[in-house]
């Protein structure tokens, strides 16, 4: 008898191929797999420098700068000045330095997908121009994470609570619910940050109201926390008296 004819080498009709098993994964498993894959892939990609703000040099007028075509500016190569931060200059002509440009070091996937008030809504810079209306960021930021602990605890929590909610809602409604919770989290961040920025614009830098987010509009927001928190609340509503074993033992 050849080795291929032995019983334990024959394909079992009851065992689906790997691709079929993957297509049968739960939505929770898919979300966890995507978040982990994005985190790992992004971690192997090289850092990039993204210009986020400029500071005009003394004597330069923002109104005059805005009237100049941006193609006439040349940005010098940024130089690292602190962990995660680099600086360069905007030059007009051969040696007319008009502004100092601040850069933030980011991974490529994070740069494409992170959420911020400036990127999602609107921001105007005399040197860098207008940005905003990047609505995809309301979804993509949910699949990005800042570090290993961030992705680990979010995915572990989703693993414990996601199955219960998915079984109740079904796969499609569960995915919609999860993503909408993340979008709601981004909208709440946007409202609190927008109110803080608007308050300081109206009443001056001394304006302060507890609960508002006095962050720079370029501050990055990443993570699945809003969607995961929504899943936790749904699980608590569906099974308020359920016992959850932390790490399967406690």
Spans of model-derived segments:
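A detector for small-residue-rich transmembrane helices and their helix-helix packing motifs
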Residues: 2-250
């Amino acid at each position: 008898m050849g080795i291929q004819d032995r019983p334990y080498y024959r394909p079992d009709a009851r065992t689906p191929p790997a691709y079929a098993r993957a297509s049968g994964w739960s939505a929770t498993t898919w979300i966890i797999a995507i978040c982990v894959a994005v985190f790992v892939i992004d971690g192997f990609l090289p850092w990039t420098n993204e210009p986020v703000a400029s500071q005009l040099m003394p004597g330069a007028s923002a109104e005059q700068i805005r009237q100049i075509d941006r193609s006439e500016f040349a940005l010098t190569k940024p130089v690292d000045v602190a962990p995660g931060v680099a600086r360069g200059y905007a030059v007009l002509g051969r040696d007319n330095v008009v502004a100092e440009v601040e850069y933030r070091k980011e991974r490529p996937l994070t740069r494409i997908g992170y959420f911020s008030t400036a990127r999602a809504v609107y921001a105007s810079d005399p040197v860098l121009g207008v940005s905003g209306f990047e609505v995809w960021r309301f979804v993509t930021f949910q699949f990005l994470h800042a570090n290993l602990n961030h992705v680990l605890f979010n995915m572990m929590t989703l693993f414990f609570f996601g199955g219960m909610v998915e079984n109740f809602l079904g796969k499609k409604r569960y995915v919609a619910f999860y993503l909408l919770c993340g979008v709601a989290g981004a909208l709440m961040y946007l409202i609190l940050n927008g109110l803080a920025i608007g308050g300081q614009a109206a009443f001056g830098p001394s304006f302060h109201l507890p609960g508002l987010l006095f962050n720079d509009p370029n501050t990055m927001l990443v993570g699945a926390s809003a969607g995961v928190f929504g899943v936790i609340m749904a699980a608590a509503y569906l099974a308020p008296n359920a016992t959850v074993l932390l790490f399967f033992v406690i």
